[in-house]
């Protein structure tokens, strides 16, 4: 199990596949069928050696529509703690290792109280568009700027601090879109996000991933973006 040091501000990684125009969905599902990309998603979010103890497994946070878009035979996503965010509630049926919360802060508070001290499982945000958008915009998370910063205004960082982006290079029709995070800037004009090197990406996920893949005639590249601190 891959873990990350516990802190007052949990590290949250968004995992998303998007076209060059930032399209991520169509009619409540994915516009593409790429088994290899789905295997990558499962491997990243599960971790290389998932624990048999549910309380130590990685966490996947998703909105209600994303939960419902997963075929019932695959719900909950196995070897991961499934967290569904919904203000209206969701009937999870008999799904094990799955919980509903009204918002992400409530989920994070509960997760902190149920994980062992010292280290915490990795936390992944997996959709949909509404949660991605709210988590990419500046939040109440403490400022990234130090006390000696010359920035004219304080900057409240986004809720997430890492993005694993699969950039789909082929065109697809979409009706749901990812926030254009790469264009976000701080008050001093610097970029909020920076693209990590492929070396840094491989070190973080723990295996030697190919940077570009072609599957079923569709080309896509794997990228990791981190907060520009």
Curated annotation (Swiss-Prot):
Entry annotated with the keyword Transferase: no
CDD domains referenced in this protein's UniProt entry, alphabetically: DHFR
- Its EC number is 1.5.1.3
Pathway per the UniProt entry: Cofactor biosynthesis; tetrahydrofolate biosynthesis; 5,6,7,8-tetrahydrofolate from 7,8-dihydrofolate: step 1/1
**What does the record give as the reaction this protein catalyses?**
(6S)-5,6,7,8-tetrahydrofolate + NADP(+) = 7,8-dihydrofolate + NADPH + H(+)
The similarity annotation says: Belongs to the dihydrofolate reductase family.
Protein name as annotated: Dihydrofolate reductase
Say which species the protein is native to.
Cryptococcus neoformans var. neoformans serotype D (strain JEC21 / ATCC MYA-565)
Gene name as annotated: DFR1
């Amino acid at each position: 199990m891959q873990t990350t040091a516990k802190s007052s501000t949990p590290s949250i990684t968004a995992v998303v596949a998007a076209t060059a125009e930032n399209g991520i969905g169509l009619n409540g599902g994915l516009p593409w069928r790429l088994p290899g990309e789905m295997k990558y998603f499962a491997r990243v979010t599960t971790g290389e050696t998932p624990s048999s103890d549910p309380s130590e497994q990685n966490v996947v946070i998703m909105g209600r529509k994303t939960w419902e878009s997963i075929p019932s035979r695959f719900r909950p996503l196995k070897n991961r703690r499934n967290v569904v965010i919904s203000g209206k509630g969701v009937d999870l049926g008999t799904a094990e290792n799955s919980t509903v919360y009204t918002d992400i802060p409530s989920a994070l508070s509960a997760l902190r109280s149920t994980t062992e001290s010292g280290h915490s499982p990795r936390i992944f945000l997996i959709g949909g568009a509404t949660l991605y958008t709210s988590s990419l915009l500046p939040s109440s998370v403490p400022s990234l700027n130090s006390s000696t910063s010359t920035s004219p205004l304080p900057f409240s960082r986004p809720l997430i601090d890492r993005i694993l982006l699969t950039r789909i290079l082929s065109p697809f029709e979409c009706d749901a879109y990812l926030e254009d995070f790469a264009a976000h800037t701080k008050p001093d004009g610097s970029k909020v996000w920076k693209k990590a090197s492929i070396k840094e990406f491989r070190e973080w996920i723990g295996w030697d991933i190919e940077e570009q893949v072609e599957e079923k005639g569709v080309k896509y590249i794997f990228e990791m973006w981190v907060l520009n601190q």
